Amino acid sequence: MSRLFMILLVICVITLGTDASQAEDSGTEKKSWPMPDADLKAFQSWPLTDPDLKSAFKQYNWQRMPYGTRK
């Protein structure tokens, strides 16, 4: 029983040690859900200055405002 416990302990220490060393080597925190490059490029090129998008956003926010705060 104690051998099994020691083996599991060693495996856990090795696993945690490699995760920590990889995070230190990269200089950033380890991300659990990385975004694919294609999705990131599509998101960055999305036209945030589109007038239709702005008007729709303002209209949606206007509808969400509580009654009595509209000017």
UniProtKB/Swiss-Prot annotation:
Residues 21-28 form a propeptide. It is found in: Secreted. Its main location: secreted. GO terms for molecular function: ion channel regulator activity; toxin activity. Keywords: Cleavage on pair of basic residues, Ion channel impairing toxin, Neurotoxin, Secreted, Signal, Toxin. Residues 1-20 form the signal peptide. The keyword Secreted applies. One of its GO terms (cellular component) is extracellular region. Coiled coil: none annotated. The mature peptide does not contain cysteine residue. Belongs to the conotoxin NSf-1 superfamily. Probable neurotoxin with unknown target. Possibly targets ion channels. This is Conotoxin Pl064.
